[in-house]
Amino acid sequence: MIYTNNRESVFAHGAVIRECFPELTDQTIKLAEEAMKGMLVLPGTGPELYFVGNPPKWTENPVNDNEYTFHLNRMHHLKTLAEAYGLTGNLTYAQKAIEELSDWIDHVHAPSLYDEQGNLAPLHFDGLSPWRALEVGIRGYRTWPLIIELLADTPCFTEEFQQKLYQSVQLHCKILYEISPLLWPKADHNHYLMENLGLMALSCLFPEMPDSAKYLAHSQQELDRCMEAQCTPCGGQIEGSPSYHNGCVFWFSLRLVFARKFHLTVPEHYTEQLKKMFIHSVHATRACGGNFPWGDSHIAEKETMALAATACYMAFEDPFYLQTALYFYPPKTLMNDIRDNLWRIPDIRHLKEIMDDAVTAPIRPDLPLLAWQKDLNQVYLRTSWDKEAISLMTACRTPVQNLHAHIDAGGFDLTAFGETLVTDPAIYTYKDDENRRHFKSSFWHNCLTVNWKNMWEYKGSWAYGPQKEGYIRSVTAGDRMTAIISFHKNYEPAETTRILALIDQQFVIV
């Protein structure tokens, strides 16, 4: 038995989406038409559409970028096809989605959960594979549930297909239950958060599945652990990257969305910590909009505070979050995140009313101008919450928490007059090539370097050499000056100290 919508409610919801958000409807149908032809934009393809196969060649990596294979096997385009069916009633979209999902189940087989000695083999699910545990989790929470709910009542969803899908869902759950805890025993990575969301969503969607109750209980326990391990007392996500922080706000929020739908409770300490995470998202936003792009962060194109606001609106049904985001971002930015979640939001008309009101009455933040995130060794500083204000961010935390960090101890990002003045390079690619090496190196950051050397060895996209101690030594705020002092020993015997000082609310001295 699957917990799904029926066809009438799917079409009713789709009709309201078409009425309230016609431009988003058109975008979804455009993407669906491209997917019908096997044409997608994926990592490594640039901004251009790329033919992935018809059906897709799931296991190939034609552009030599591992993220291409990962993203293709997350099946976002099948979710889009299912949404296009819900918007139009056109069964060709449903048929295409089910044909491709069926093809994947038939031809992309999971590695064994066990090694030759009969022990669980987590490394089988931690490499370039459609069955990497993260992709298992993302299919579980982000794409398969909506594909199933939107298409389960169509003629395409045959008993034969349902049986093979059911078996694959069981395997997904077993991997997430047995393997993921071995990959992330400390629960201290965003992957583990998504993997447990996948386990939660699938166990809720298939309540009569053997071990469903066990899987659900495990997911709730581990999501609590994720919040405890990944969110610092100051509200920041431990990886120290604003993009991943905003992503985690979205993922932590989805637990509340699923809990409301399936009548589950979430501990109060979890929801209160999530609200603190949104405040951190606001601090991590430049005065002129966009993330302070520390580490593997994007600036403005995705995973900004707009995503965190959309997520918290879905979690708490409070317009405050959307109103705050619209102070920094144009409505189009929020709409990109809203479009991806329209089928998770029950009251579309109410959302439309809130967005219309928020556009005309955004909320300017009423928060401190200085935020020293001591657990992350990060500092956010601005002269006001005006968009023309001086705003800067600096950080110094070595050894790094994980490899989304760059080789940039004591670096900084600075904006003023509504413009970026000194930028952190942000993320460019995950592909292990010269671009990745440059974008992570000290030489492409606003850092002090010694003897033309990196602060520590860059071994590859996901490998560094050892690092030495580095931290924010002090932050002092007076009537005329705020000074931030960072310190690290990565150039021993030299010791590196940097002072960033905001003077008279008018200029910055380095």
Regions found by a protein language model. Give the residues of each.
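Short, flexible loop/turn elements at secondary-structure junctions
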Residues: 383-385, 398, 448, 452, ...
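Short alpha-helical hairpin
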Residues: 39-59, 72
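Aromatic-lined, polymer-binding surfaces characteristic
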Residues: 55, 64-291, 297-298
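Extreme N-terminal leader/anchor segments
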Residues: 1-44
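Glycine-rich phosphate/pyrophosphate-binding beta-alpha loops
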Residues: 396-409, 427-432, 490-494
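Active-site rim segments in enzyme catalytic domains, especially the processed small/beta chain
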Residues: 408-473
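Acidic, contiguous internal or C-terminal segments within carbohydrate-active enzymes
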Residues: 477, 482-510
